[in-house]
Structures are given as C-alpha cells and as structure tokens.
Amino acid sequence: MTKKLSIVRLKPKPECFDEFLQNIRAWQLQVHADDDHLLMRTNEEVVAVVVRDSEMLHENIQRGVAWLDSQRPLLQEYNEVDRHTIPMTGDLVI
C-alpha cells in the first residue's frame, strides 16, 4: 500500500501564535490518532507533517481544509496565490 507524505507550512499572526499552535495540536491528535504526524514550530511558522495511506488522502485533505477554514482568522497570508498555507504532498519513498 502506498503511503503519502504531506507537509503544510502555516504562518499564524504573531498575536495568535500560541492559540493556533494549541488548536492544531488538539486537532491533529484527534484526527490523525492512527497516522504518523508531527508538528514543528519556528519563530514565525508552524509546519505540519503527516504520513498516511494513499486511500485516506482525499478524505483527510477535505477534512483539513474544513478545519483550516475555521482557523483562517488566526493566520497570515503568505501571498495572493498560496494564501494561508504552503502545502506539499507526494509518495513516501523510504
């Protein structure tokens, strides 16, 4: 079975950073309880990393976008094209 690796960069507003980090931690623990998932923080960004079965990708993305819609007021836009996230997904090789 093919595994997918997804990396999503998010940039919370400075005054909302801790609130957003708490929200995404709670959401990932709830939604990705059976999958491998990690969160990384930098001074300005939160980066979510998830490994999942390829069959779950479409459903997980739909659920993730719905959750993200509720969090957009806490996030800064990167630019007019990427908006609030910079995502990357592909086949896990190793």
Q: What residue spans do the PLM features occupy?
A:
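Active-site-flanking beta-strand signature of metal-NTP-handling nucleotidyl enzymes
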Residues: 3-10, 47-49
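Short, surface-exposed ligand-recognition loops at beta-strand->loop->(often short) alpha-helix junctions
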Residues: 9-23
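Short, charged/polar surface micro-motifs in flexible loops or helix N-caps
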Residues: 14, 45-46, 53-58
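An amphipathic, aromatic/His-enriched active-site/gating alpha helix that lines ligand/cofactor pockets
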Residues: 26-37, 51-85
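A short beta-turn/loop motif at secondary-structure boundaries
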Residues: 38-44
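Short aromatic-enriched loop/helix-cap "lid" or pocket-rim segments at secondary-structure transitions
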Residues: 49-51, 94
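Short, low-order "capping/linker" segments at domain edges
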Residues: 84-94
